[in-house]
């Protein structure tokens, strides 16, 4: 199995898009990308818009190689909607390119879902059902493709228990030699998700970490996340790849270093330095005005690559 991260915060955008290749079969997991429209009361910097464009190109490129597409929930950084979106780099044409002729294994559109995502799911299905090869609601389901299996968790909270953001699905892909578990937006801060991960004991765990940058709104997620991740480290053999929400916090590296084993970001999994553009949006805007500010080495390399 080839494991190819496509887009995430360590690569400059909001996403946790992943591509898996097993033999001749391509599996595209959570093919969405977005930018936070406001951070520090600022819109995305030019570098973020460029990162969004590059991530969109990558997702479209790998969509052409996929026969199966999975969607954990209906936030726009996890699926590509059928509309023109500036901060999603989306369009009807791009969505059709991703979903047409594919087997879609997706979160149930009306069960264990909040009102916002229910509306998004309705719009998605209204368009996707006309072009997809087949659509299966995947909650708690397993699919056997002969040379590999795809197993989905029951719906688990998007973040903490009782979260108003609804529910997400985790997905485990196993080819008999390697297993990869994509934990989506569980943030590793609810027991249901952690128990399922430990039960499955994957070779690779890919997860969005706790949203520590929102501690003033969501409470003490740092300690909960750290305790749960250390438990996963202790009770599984998983190589942990942690990205998404946690990388929106400038202090993510300190969080990583305090864990019993340091995880990798998507960028590091690919052998690159992390470029957490959103966390440094203030600095990026200042750089664009010609001011001198300090940013991490990975961001410097990303900016240099744009010239």
From Swiss-Prot:
InterPro entries noted in UniProt: Metallo-B-lactamas, RibonucZ/Hydroxyglut_hydro, UPF0173_UPF0282_UlaG_hydrolase, UPF0282_hydrls
A Pfam family of this chain: Lactamase_B_2
Family note: Belongs to the UPF0282 family.
Protein name: UPF0282 protein PH1002
